[in-house]
Amino acid sequence: MKSELFKNELKTITSDDIRDFAKVVLDDAPDYFFKVAASSTGKYHPAYALGDGGLMRHTKAVLRIYNYIIGLEQYQNQFDERWIDLGRVACLAHDIQKSGTAEIYEEKAKDGKKVFTVFNHPLLAAEYIRNYKGLYLEDDELEIIADAVSSHMGQWNTSDRESIVLPKPKSQLEKIVHLADYLASRKDIDISFKDDTDAYDLPDIETYKCPYKKHKDELLTDVAKTDPEYLEWLHENVNMREPMKTFVNELLKNKTN
């Protein structure tokens, strides 16, 4: 079950029926949601959200930050736990259609096209939630989740390439979900996943390309052969993110064996 990849995050949802619904939402998600990077261009998200599984890690980070925010003393006794749980589902679902519906993604990928972020993905994700009306939760609760999902882009709600204007957050819940997503998207805020074994599936080392300037876009295995001193320098001087950290360590270990 796909939702098993979010077992730690699902544990933070206290209402049994809302947690069960969150599992359904994740299990029904497009396969790409668990595989692609959070940013199709690499411009708008931190290193941990790039590469294979980046969107999944970004989603985990959004919920983690949401839980930090909602746990502050200033919010104590302001909201009931059920309301907070609906926000947790919104965090998990906010980018669940980031590259469009499963059909749209598969059609583009089949033709070998690069699949970019779809601007109206908040609206698609909100509709994804509304499609469960009458099944798991009360309709008004589904609407609370859908509204938080549709407005998660906040002030970045227009595009030069689209005529669509996305809604901005209005309720306190919508504003907190947006804030969590905003903070999880900052390049200078790092999130550690070292204790979350499900958060990172390493890509194939044989096809992984170096992200750093000197050997940018060269196969890392080739760099290990042509410039092994560079890998040693990285190991000693650079605070590398995954998967680069694991790969460099592995290549250096193989060199000494």
What are these regions (language model features)?
Residues 63, 67, 86, 122-126, ...:
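An amphipathic alpha-helix signature
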Residues 58, 94, 121-122, 152-153:
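Histidine-centered active-site/metal-ligand motif
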Residues 100-105, 111, 160-161, 188-189:
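A short secondary-structure junction signal
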Residues 14-15, 149, 217:
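Extracellular/surface recognition and adhesion modules
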Residues 1-108:
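Acidic/His-rich, divalent-metal-binding segments that scaffold phosphate/diphosphate chemistry
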Residues 198-257:
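Accessory DNA-engaging acidic/polar modules
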Residues 78, 87-88, 135-196:
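Histidine/acidic-rich helix-loop-helix segments that form or flank divalent-metal centers
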Residues 108-128:
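Divalent-cation-assisted or electrostatically stabilized phosphate/pyrophosphate-binding catalytic cores
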